[in-house]
Amino acid sequence: LDKVFFGAWIELEDEEGEILRYRIVGEDEIDLPHGYISVDAPLARGLIGKFVDDEVTVRLPKGETTYFIAKVQYERPHWDKRPTPEFS
């Protein structure tokens, strides 16, 4: 899939060329240091339904920012260093 939905890992490029990585998750999974953002966050709301190679302008608390969607994936990528929870 190259469309952004809930649960996606996303690589964005900002206007300065910096690569940013996020995962869209539910409220109980938010982990900002690891890039896990709420599905209700302004950034996530602006990305859901968009595709790889789309340019998206999102209104954030700091103002409008434009991002290029470089990659969307639904399997855990190598860069996700968040510990995997252990279930017993």
Predicted regions and their residues:
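Short, solvent-exposed secondary-structure boundary/capping segments
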Residues: L32-Y36, R76-F87
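Non-DNA-binding regulatory cores of transcription-related proteins
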Residues: L1-Y67, Q73
